[in-house]
Regions:
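PLP-dependent aspartate aminotransferase-fold enzymes
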Residues: 12-15, 22, 52-193, 207-208
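Conserved PLP-binding catalytic core of the aspartate aminotransferase-like
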Residues: 313-317, 327-359, 376, 384-388
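Active-site core of PLP-dependent enzymes with the aminotransferase class I/II
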Residues: 176, 196-220, 280, 383
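PLP-dependent enzyme catalytic core of the Aspartate aminotransferase-like
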Residues: 302-305, 376-413
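Conserved PLP phosphate-binding loop immediately N-terminal to the Schiff-base lysine helix
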Residues: 194-207, 222-244
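Active-site PLP attachment segment
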Residues: 245-276, 287-294
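Structural motif of enzymes handling amino- and sulfur-group chemistry
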Residues: 285-308, 312
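Glycine-rich phosphate-binding segment of PLP-dependent enzymes
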Residues: 3, 7-63, 80-82, 297
Length: 413
């Protein structure tokens, strides 16, 4: 049987399994290029990748002389630095450390907000709790989404830091949170967000909401982390924040860029907040040369096929929206965007039954049912090599199973 990787093996293979382009990695090995480098240096390939990531993050061609000016910039909202790590959790943790370093000394240097209590703003769930966000598996990142509640309570009680959730797509509530938590003894340490909440129903934050939030953050000296671990390498231009016209201070990148070949995440940062010393940011395997080559291969493919990627993504999301509208007995619409589209169901049972049926038909998608306040959805993340013909076939299979699901429900009435 032929299986369709409808979630790209949890976002790792934008170009599918065994993409021929990654054969260049074997050629590099044959030429004697090693993967490992000394852990406080970077090889030529990694340095080249850093330049190209910064260029892409700023909407520039890597050969544009303007990239050299960006690399020395130290302004909020201008991404000019790359810290090479290994996993997305470490990338996000680096951003959190840089946010906290404005409140607590790392190496004896004075900090701008000494004595204030740092407050992290994160996206709320539909009940106002913390489970709407997901920023990795380190301890502090897990407290942002409601894990370690006793630990978090003690940290807050001791005045170490506080976590506050902000409602989804509510501009007024965000501005009020900024106003409230910038009064002594508190100070907003940062706003952490994804653009598409793939761990919470595939809900998409709107461009209007995010632009308003970014402006409120800029006005209050609050750095912004745009967590693109799951959305990077899935859009023309490589980063979804570019399509929104956003200017984050930190961007996490990983998963898709490595094409499933190597774990190799990075944090892109504004030089204005790059406060970690060399050994405060170092990860032994972060600078691997062949991992960087995998990034460059993925980026070259996406940049050469941007129009196709955009067209297929639009066709899939539009087709999914039309499809759910034809099945109102079980569907409530769509969430997400382009290849990262989620079908929203009226019940958890329907979402689970639909995904089970699609799995039997050799399509790998899954129902998100493990969070009590999360909308029941079937999540997809199609590989970028998906064609419009494949989208048509996939939607036809969806239609058949939704029709069968509606029929089964009617038979029970």
């Amino acid at each position: 049987k032929v299986y369709f990787a409808g979630k790209s093996e949890h976002y790792h293979i934008p170009l599918g399994h065994d993409f021929p382009g990654y054969g260049l990695i074997e050629w590099a090995k044959a030429l004697g290029i090693p993967n490992a480098t000394h852990n406080n240096t970077r090889g030529y390939i990694t340095r080249l990748l850093e330049r190209r990531l910064i260029a892409a993050a700023n909407g520039l061609d890597p050969d544009d002389p303007a990239v050299d000016q960006v690399l020395v910039a130290r302004e909020p909202g201008v991404l000019s630095c790359v810290i090479n790590l290994e996993t997305g959790s470490l990338a996000v943790e680096a951003a959190l450390k840089m946010m906290l370093s404005r409140f607590y000394e790392i190496d004896g240097k004075a900090v701008p907000y000494a004595g204030r209590i740092p407050v992290f703003l994160v996206i709320a769930d539909n009940a106002g709790g913390l489970t709407g966000n997901y920023h990795g598996t380190t301890v502090v990142a897990q407290t942002l989404r409601g894990l370690w509640p006793d630990f978090t309570e003690k940290a807050e009680g001791a005045g170490l830091y506080k976590v506050v959730s902000v409602p989804i797509n509510d501009e007024a509530a965000f501005r009020e949170a900024i106003r409230t938590w910038n009064q002594a003894p508190y100070k907003t340490a940062g706003f952490c967000h994804e653009i598409i909440l793939m761990n919470y129903g595939g809900i998409r934050l709107t461009p209007e909401y995010l632009r308003a939030a970014y402006q409120a953050c800029r006005d209050s000296d609050t750095p912004v982390l745009c967590d693109e671990i799951q959305s990077c390498a899935w859009y023309d231009g490589l980063f979804l924040f570019r399509k929104y016209g956003l200017t984050p201070d930190f961007v996490s990148a990983g998963k898709g860029f490595g094409g499933g070949c190597y774990p190799a995440s990075r944090i892109l940062a504004s030089g204005a907040f790059d406060s970690l010393t060399q050994f405060g940011a170092l990860v032994t395997n972060g600078q691997e040369e062949l991992a960087s080559l995998a990034y460059l291969i993925t980026m070259a493919f996406i940049q050469a096929n941007g129009e196709h990627i955009e067209a297929v993504g639009r066709a899939f999301h539009r087709g999914a929206a039309e499809l759910t509208a034809r099945h109102p007995a079980v569907c409530a619409g769509v969430e997400g965007d382009a290849h990262m589209t989620a079908l929203r169901f009226l019940s958890v049972e329907d979402a689970a039954a639909f995904c089970a049926a699609m799995n039997r038909r050799c399509v790998d998608i899954s129902a998100q049912t493990y969070k009590p306040n999360c909308p029941p959805v079937a999540l997809t993340k199609l590989p970028l090599i998906t064609t419009e013909t494949m989208v048509g076939r996939l939607l036809a299979l969806f239609d058949e199973e939704l029709t069968a699901l509606e029929g089964a429900k009617e038979a029970k009435v």
